[in-house]
């Protein structure tokens, strides 16, 4: 008996919900009605989701098969930043996308290959730079020391010349006032 009461409660609740949402509920169409509502809810959900791409009608080209477009496909294109939709121009005609799928795919492949080459080059270079960087650093330090020593030698020479020049000039000045 309790099982029948539960079913009655479910049926009465379903009737109440149907009347609340403005649907006519009939027991013989219960399954068909539910399936129709489920399909309607799915399509409504797809169209109600926001998407930054403009939703424009697509004209299938002769070499392509007609394709079912859903909002989920457009959302995927938004996330992957693929601009593979036709643009509607001012004169009323459709323009082909700037990049076709083949071109964008080849660009991605080229980019990934160049990135891998750079990565390999950097890893090889960084592995070889360990001892070389120390060697270069030592060479730079030696060069600095040489430059400093040369400057000191030049300063000493210039100071000696100045002392010599003053020494030679001093007797002339001493003789001049006499």
Swiss-Prot record:
Residues 34-47 have a biased composition (Basic residues). Keywords: Chromosomal rearrangement. Pfam families: LNP1. Residues 147-167 have a biased composition (Basic and acidic residues). It comes from the Eukaryota. Disulfide bonds: none annotated. The keyword Phosphoprotein does not apply. Residues 28-55, 89-108, 147-178 are annotated as: Disordered. It is linked to A chromosomal aberration involving LNP1 is found in a form of T-cell acute lymphoblastic leukemia (T-ALL). Translocation t(3;11)(q12.2;p15.4) with NUP98. This is Leukemia NUP98 fusion partner 1. The gene is LNP1.
């Amino acid at each position: 008996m309790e099982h029948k009461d539960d079913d009655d409660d479910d049926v009465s609740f379903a009737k109440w919900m149907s009347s609340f949402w403005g649907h006519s509920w009939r027991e013989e169409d219960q399954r068909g009605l539910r399936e129709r509502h489920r399909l309607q809810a799915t399509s409504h959900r797809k169209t109600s989701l926001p998407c930054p791409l403009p939703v424009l009608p697509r004209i299938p080209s002769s070499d392509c098969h007609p394709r079912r477009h859903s909002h989920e496909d457009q959302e995927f294109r938004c996330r992957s930043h693929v601009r593979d939709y036709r643009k509607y121009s001012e004169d009323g005609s459709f323009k082909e996308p700037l990049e076709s799928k083949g071109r964008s795919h080849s660009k991605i492949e080229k980019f990934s290959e160049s990135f891998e080459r750079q990565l390999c080059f950097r890893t090889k270079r960084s592995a070889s730079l360990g001892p070389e960087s120390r060697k270069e650093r030592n060479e730079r330090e030696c060069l600095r020391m040489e430059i400093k020593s040369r400057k000191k030698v030049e300063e000493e020479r210039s100071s000696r010349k100045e002392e010599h020049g003053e020494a030679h000039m001093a007797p002339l000045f001493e003789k001049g006032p006499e």
